[in-house]
Amino acid sequence: MYLIEQQDEALNYRRRHSGLIGVSSKVPIRDRAVLSLVYTPGVAEACRVISEDPLSSFELTSRGNTVAIVTDGSDLFGLAAGLPEAALPLLEAKSVLFKTFAGIDAFPICLDQRDPLSVVETILALTPTFGAICLDHISAPHSFTIADHLEKGSNIPVFSNQHHGSAILVLGALMNALKVVGKQLNEIRVVIGGAGVA
């Protein structure tokens, strides 16, 4: 009974708030002077500077503190050929975690594409907006193809939750095990088998 009540409560919580995330301004517009700094004519100068130095977008815009959390919904809690929309609650929840625990603005992006190269092309087209990409819940083997292509073709960091996250967990477990047995990494041999997908 508790599980059903908890599930209902989780759904009602999301309904009450129309999802978990939203966009809000960092600056209050109280008068025309501030409006002219934020929008016309002030915005033109920021655009000009970025057109001459694209990396300045990391300091003049929110780009340096944003990550795109991207999925195609293909590996979502065992749901067969999951719809991308079904992943939105998960990505919103992860966005809340990014903001709460790291102060990073994360945006959920659910792609309605299954072809790995189309996914790569779409994500690469989005990179001017974000400071990093986080791939999440994309089924193997497509997830490997997508991560590999993005790591080679993107000019911003790419993190695959299932691949890199699994590796971090295994390394953490190994380092803690070494502490327990009182050994150093260079004193042991380790064999890790598997494709690296959680």
Segments from the language model and where they lie:
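N-terminal ligand-binding/catalytic initiation module
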Residues: 1-158
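Glycine-rich phosphate/diphosphate-binding loop of Rossmann-like nucleotide-binding domains
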Residues: 77, 82-102, 160, 165-198
